Curated annotation (Swiss-Prot):
It comes from Blochmanniella floridana. The keyword Transferase does not apply. Signal peptide: none annotated. Belongs to the IF-1 family. Residues 1-72 form the S1-like domain. It comes from the Bacteria. GO terms for molecular function: ribosome binding; rRNA binding; translation initiation factor activity. It is found in: Cytoplasm. This is Translation initiation factor IF-1. Keywords: Cytoplasm, Initiation factor, Protein biosynthesis, RNA-binding, rRNA-binding. Component of the 30S ribosomal translation pre-initiation complex which assembles on the 30S ribosome in the order IF-2 and IF-3, IF-1 and N-formylmethionyl-tRNA(fMet); mRNA recruitment can occur at any time during PIC assembly. One of the essential components for the initiation of protein synthesis. Stabilizes the binding of IF-2 and IF-3 on the 30S subunit to which N-formylmethionyl-tRNA(fMet) subsequently binds. Helps modulate mRNA selection, yielding the 30S pre-initiation complex (PIC). Upon addition of the 50S ribosomal subunit IF-1, IF-2 and IF-3 are released leaving the mature 70S translation initiation complex. GO terms for cellular component: cytosol.
Length: 72
């Protein structure tokens, strides 16, 4: 199986949802639902409303993503 190319985009957290899900507005204006990656969860990095984050999207479903980095 070939690993697909993931799309990385920057966005701002708009809302916190249950089960460590977040509503994120991307730079291009789209709003997606994103969950936290395992490394962020393992290191107890806190993500709050208004934080700038880097989101990874798959080409298969552009409405869901994974938060892989929180900017300072």
């Amino acid at each position: 199986m070939i690993k697909e190319d993931n799309i990385e985009m920057h966005g701002i957290v708009l809302d916190t949802l249950p089960n460590t899900m977040f509503r994120v507005q991307l730079e291009n204006g789209h709003k997606i639902t994103a969950h936290i990656s395992g490394k962020i969860r393992k290191n107890y990095i806190r993500i709050l409303t208004g934080d700038k984050v880097t989101v990874e999207l798959t080409p298969y479903d552009l409405s869901k993503g994974r938060i892989i980095f929180r900017s300072r």
